[in-house]
């Protein structure tokens, strides 16, 4: 099943690259943030996978409007995979 998520993530990133390469130049620069929303989405999907990455990208697109000041808004770091960062209540092996 993990393989399917990788394929979906790569497909989403390929679609974003297509947009960035062929559609975005026709529209001109519109993003108020650095990195741009498409770069943010590609990084978020690569870092967190297609589900959480798409959610982060959708939240970012919701903030990209004329009434928001914009600015530098990087993708959050992935949480550490140590047992101390786990939110579960049970013991770890």
Swiss-Prot record:
Q: Tell me where in or outside the cell this protein is found.
A: Cell inner membrane
Residue numbers spanned by region Disordered: 74-93
Q: Which InterPro entries match?
A: Membr_insert_effic_factor_YidD
Q: Might you report a single GO cellular component term?
A: plasma membrane
Q: Describe its membrane topology.
A: Peripheral membrane protein
Keywords for this entry? Cell inner membrane, Cell membrane, Membrane
Give one Pfam hit by family name.
YidD
Which top-level group of life is the source organism from? Bacteria
Q: Does the keyword Iron-sulfur apply?
A: no
Residue stretches of biased makeup (Low complexity):
74-85
Q: Which PANTHER family match?
A: MEMBRANE PROTEIN INSERTION EFFICIENCY FACTOR-RELATED (PTHR33383:SF1)
Name the NCBIfam families on file. membrane protein insertion efficiency factor YidD (TIGR00278)
Functionally, this protein is described as follows: Could be involved in insertion of integral membrane proteins into the membrane.
Q: Which family does it belong to?
A: Belongs to the UPF0161 family.
Stated name of the protein? Putative membrane protein insertion efficiency factor
């Amino acid at each position: 099943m993990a393989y399917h998520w990788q394929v979906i993530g790569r497909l989403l990133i390929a679609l974003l690259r297509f947009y960035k390469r062929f559609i975005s130049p026709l529209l001109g620069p519109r993003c108020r943030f650095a990195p741009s929303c498409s770069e943010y989405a590609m990084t978020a999907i690569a870092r967190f996978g297609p589900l959480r990455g798409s959610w982060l990208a959708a939240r970012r697109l919701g903030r990209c409007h004329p009434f928001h000041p914009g600015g530098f808004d990087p993708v959050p770091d992935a949480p550490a995979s140590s047992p101390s960062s786990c939110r579960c209540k049970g013991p770890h092996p």
